[in-house]
Amino acid sequence: MSEIAQDSNVSIFSKNEKKARELILKLGLKPIQGVSRVTFKKKDGQIFAIDRPEVYKSQGGNFVVFGEAKVDDFTQRLAKAQESLQQNEGVLPAGQDAVSKDPQSIQADMQAAADSATDKPSADDAVDDAEVDETGLNADDIELVMQQAGVPRAKAAKALKEHDSDIVNAIMALSG
């Protein structure tokens, strides 16, 4: 018997799995090609992901998905994305010069920014001092937003409240 190469994409099915697949085809389910990932989100926000799933569609429009479901670790994926952004931060897009303004306009912009910063505190700074109601928010979510956006707890809680506890949108709003 010949060996299967380690990097090949071969699936070996048990006898019971072969029977189940034959029954699925007899039910009229059609295989859907080209699906690389399927995710499911539960009510409590937990996300399950199936990489390289086998997807079938019924005549009624329902889908049947086979594959190994894993809990999707969003924080790990977010950290990887931020790491890649930081690595590419110093790289300018092709065709863009490092200096897009003349020196006088840059100095004028810097002076205007310095003047506005010393004149009055921003509205966001007032949020830092005030206590924000954290009821209905998950403490882990607040900590994650604080860590990823680099903001104080009050700002993180306020952003989560404004975005209905959506971590991604809260981080994007604070980072932008």
Swiss-Prot record:
GO terms for cellular component: nascent polypeptide-associated complex; nucleus. Residues 85-127 are annotated as: Disordered. One of its GO terms (biological process) is protein transport. Component of the nascent polypeptide-associated complex (NAC), a dynamic component of the ribosomal exit tunnel, protecting the emerging polypeptides from interaction with other cytoplasmic proteins to ensure appropriate nascent protein targeting. The NAC complex also promotes mitochondrial protein import by enhancing productive ribosome interactions with the outer mitochondrial membrane and blocks the inappropriate interaction of ribosomes translating non-secretory nascent polypeptides with translocation sites in the membrane of the endoplasmic reticulum. Residues 137-176 form the UBA domain. Residues 14-78 form the NAC-A/B domain. Belongs to the NAC-alpha family. Pfam families: NAC, UBA_HYPK. Keywords: Cytoplasm, Nucleus, Protein transport, Transport. It is found in: Cytoplasm; Nucleus. Part of the nascent polypeptide-associated complex (NAC), consisting of EGD2 and EGD1. NAC associates with ribosomes via EGD1. This is Nascent polypeptide-associated complex subunit alpha. It comes from Kluyveromyces lactis (strain ATCC 8585 / CBS 2359 / DSM 70799 / NBRC 1267 / NRRL Y-1140 / WM37). Its main location: cytoplasm. InterPro entries: EGD2/NACA0like (IPR016641), NAC-like_UBA (IPR044034), NAC_A/B_dom_sf (IPR038187), Nas_poly-pep-assoc_cplx_dom (IPR002715). The keyword rRNA-binding does not apply. The keyword ATP-binding does not apply.
